[in-house]
Amino acid sequence: MRLDLYPAIDLKDGQVVRLRQGRMDEATVYGVDPVRIAARWAEAGARWIHVVDLDGALRGRPQNAAAVRAIVEALRQRHPGVRVQLGGGLRTLEALEAALALGVSRAIIGTSALEGDVAARAVARFGPDRVAVSIDARGGFVAARGWVEVTRVRAVDLAVRMREVGVRTVVYTDIATDGMLTGPNFAELEMMGRTGLDVIASGGISSLEDIRRLTEIPGVAGAIIGRALYTGAVDLAEALSLCGETRDT
């Protein structure tokens, strides 16, 4: 199965950082120029860039719009085939609309998927290709509001609910493995893959072997890769080749 790879750019105070298990107090800064880093991944052949507004995720509203706009505009000029998906603090239709107005191709709904009918309304308004739902889990249960609160909702159950209201794509993050370079939670991903959704896996990728195993899980359509790229544990061009991805530059 083809797997789309999403190099990650996590923004905190305008800088590119990586966290460990979502803890803001364990942020490692990998750069102060997100545009340059996005260009680096695009030049390696990426089709997508995954951008997260960490400040927005914590505060409940977007905080790094200027940096996101700069990334989108630079890619449009130099690498027009590369698309951006954005998450973090997008909990209302208004926030989603503002994110899409920045030029991103897909906006990711966070905590709001648990509350009311935001996901259903977003799909109806923007279409299933323009929105996705982020399902972040600890021990199989959904974590909300910047991963601060762990609910009693099972991740798989939320995924099924999202499918029933028209959502097509979910980003599944296993918090325990996020930023740890210990390998993804393959067992949870196999369960998520059986929901009928296109699942984008996030958390724990540490090697090309991890990526190869993800290509074998039905329903897993993509993978977000962060710390492994920034530490050099994985070469993006090699990973893209393994996944059968090529892009004309």
UniProtKB/Swiss-Prot annotation:
Subcellular location field: Cytoplasm
CDD domains the UniProt entry points to: HisA
Active-site residue numbers: 10 (proton acceptor), 136 (proton donor)
UniProt keyword annotations, A-Z: Amino-acid biosynthesis, Cytoplasm, Histidine biosynthesis, Isomerase
Gene Ontology cellular component annotations, sorted alphabetically: cytoplasm
Transmembrane segments: none
Gene Ontology BP, a term: L-tryptophan biosynthetic process
Pfam families: His_biosynth
Pathway: Amino-acid biosynthesis; L-histidine biosynthesis; L-histidine from 5-phospho-alpha-D-ribose 1-diphosphate: step 4/9
Alphabetized HAMAP family for the sequence: HisA
Protein name per Swiss-Prot or TrEMBL: 1-(5-phosphoribosyl)-5-[(5-phosphoribosylamino)methylideneamino] imidazole-4-carboxamide isomerase
Species the sequence originates in: Symbiobacterium thermophilum (strain DSM 24528 / JCM 14929 / IAM 14863 / T)
